[in-house]
């Protein structure tokens, strides 16, 4: 990958009251990435190595990211895969892996560990990704459109599983999606982005029922309905290599003024936990929920 392909010009990335941008890379790798914060990818198939069994790969993760990593065995072991484990360590760690696979509702978990990634279904691979994200006992999981490649029935099962596990384990989930139906099903709080800028942040009910940014309103009205059919948003998404100034939605916004093209709005509080970045927020009105 090319180095220095992007930079952070301003702002903070705050986690548990600390700015992660101030952390040394060693601390980020050892304590944050893959431990306190884990990740569920969009495509689980490409995230597995096809030449190793599922069990081998999960056990490798157990070695490097387990909460017990400070154990002298993990710190000093030169072994890479299962055949280097002392029998007592192997049994304890394998038992924890099997427990996790049962928790994500995978049938016959012992048999699954012996399989290769191509030998299980897409839904099972995504459940394995969820189990691997849970293994370090994280405080936050970033889920990157984890249901995109799944059929509707499996999508519903995965969403229900994520919701249940997050509640039971008290884990925050940052869920990235372009699917408004999925947003309605799983999210407690929603941030709407357009061309890399935050437009509006609101509780889920406020997002669907009282949208305050013109883009949020237009986005919801673009959902097909019996009342207005399919209503698109005029114009095109800007090229991010040279985005428009001010609010990036202003070239397509029916409420835009000259000020919108030169100045980016600050946050305006609409209600508790609901704010919008717009000089001309729309009146509150219900537009219905996604279906």
Task: List where the protein language model places each region.
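ABC ATPase NBD coupling module
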Residues: 5-8, 19-38, 56, 64, ...
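Conserved ABC transporter NBD signature motif
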Residues: 8-19, 75
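Conserved ABC ATPase "signature" region
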Residues: 19, 73-111, 220
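Conserved ABC ATPase signature
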Residues: 116-120, 124
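A short, proline-enriched helix->beta-strand linker immediately N-terminal to the Walker B motif
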Residues: 135-139
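P-loop NTP-binding/switch modules centered on Walker-like glycine-rich loops
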Residues: 142, 146, 150-229
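Short catalytic/signature loops enriched in Gly
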Residues: 201-291
């Amino acid at each position: 990958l090319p180095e220095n392909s992007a930079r952070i010009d301003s702002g903070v990335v705050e986690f548990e009251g600390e700015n992660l941008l101030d952390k040394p890379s060693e601390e980020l790798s050892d304590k944050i990435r893959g431990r306190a914060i884990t990740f569920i990818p969009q495509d689980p198939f490409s995230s597995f190595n096809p030449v190793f069994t599922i069990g081998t790969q999960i056990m490798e993760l157990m070695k490097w990211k387990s909460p017990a990593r400070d154990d002298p065995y993990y710190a000093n072991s030169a072994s890479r895969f299962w055949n280097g484990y002392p029998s007592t360590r192997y049994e304890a760690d394998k038992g924890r892996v099997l427990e996790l696979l049962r928790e994500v509702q995978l049938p016959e978990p012992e048999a699954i560990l012996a399989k290769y990634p191509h030998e299980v279904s897409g839904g099972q691979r995504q459940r394995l990704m969820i189990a691997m994200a849970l293994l370090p006992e994280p405080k936050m999981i970033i889920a990157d459109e984890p249901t995109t490649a799944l059929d509707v029935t499996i999508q519903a099962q995965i969403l229900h599983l994520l919701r249940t596990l997050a509640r039971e384990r008290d884990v925050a989930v940052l869920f990235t999606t372009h699917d408004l139906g999925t947003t309605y099903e799983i999210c407690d709080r929603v941030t709407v982005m357009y061309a890399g800028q935050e437009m509006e942040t609101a509780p889920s009910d406020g997002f669907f029922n009282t949208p305050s940014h013109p883009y949020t309103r237009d986005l919801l009205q673009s959902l097909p309905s019996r009342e207005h059919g399919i209503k698109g948003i005029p114009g095109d998404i800007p090229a991010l290599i040279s985005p428009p100034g001010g609010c990036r939605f202003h070239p397509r916004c029916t409420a835009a003024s000259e000020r919108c093209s030169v100045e980016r709005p600050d946050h305006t509080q609409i209600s508790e936990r609901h704010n919008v970045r717009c000089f001309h927020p729309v009146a509150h009105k219900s537009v219905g929920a996604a279906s």
